[in-house]
Amino acid sequence: MSRISLEVCVDDPDGLEAAVAGGADRIELCSALGAGGLTPSPGLMAVAAPPPVPVYAMIRPRAGDFIYHRADLEVMRRDIDAARHAGLAGVVLGASLADGRLDARMLTKLAGHAAGMGLTLHRAFDLVPDFAEAMEIAVDLGFERILTSGGAKTAPEAVDTLERLIELSAGRISIMPGSGITSDTIEALVPRLAITEVHSSCSSAEPANDMRLVEMGFAAPERRRTDAAKIRAMRARLDAPAAKA
């Protein structure tokens, strides 16, 4: 098995530094990881470039569902423009219909607007009723990879499904497991799965440093921060001989 790439999601400048220092191969740049990841600000995109490793910006204009309308599309197009202007390598996209299927028309418009940039399909994929249908849409639109937990809350809970997705992909698109992947849980996935990349936050919990901020509603009692040591630990597990067996 060839070297497995590690993508780390971050949502602030400190996270960017930690990801690079820890040895991430690619960065998913977001804001508000506590809400599942939203579009980063143009300022954060600019700080991320020129990056020492490829950076893909999450394009998700709001928390909640992935059902987008005309006004959302205009916002997302402008966010893609900001990522391109910042010199980022790619964008992370997803859009759903009310029944959970991928919104092929919306994704066609978004992918077309991002022409020339790398494309990752995010975990809107995990909500679809038919993985095969959704994968064909992603392949037809030129996505490089699908970030997925196999439809479960965490990827280690859905190893059998992930294995089927990899077989279904037939080398046409990368299946990148994500959600709940740590240096302790990665052994559930490799070497069993023939994957070339994984996604993780590699983060540590950190309590709020001022409870007044929590009381006033400006901060959560706890937040996750990208941890360079956890990235190094994950990298070591991925590079271990057992992971390549």
Curated annotation (Swiss-Prot):
Species of the source: Rhizobium meliloti (strain 1021) (Ensifer meliloti)
Similarity remark: Belongs to the CutC family.
InterPro entries: CutC-like (IPR005627), CutC-like_dom_sf (IPR036822)
Coiled coil: none
Compartment annotation: Cytoplasm
Subcellular location, principal: cytoplasm
Pfam families from the UniProt entry: CutC (PF03932)
Tree of life domain: Bacteria
Protein name per UniProt: PF03932 family protein CutC
GO cellular component entries: cytoplasm
HAMAP family noted in UniProt: CutC (MF_00795)
Keywords: Cytoplasm
MF (Gene Ontology): copper ion binding
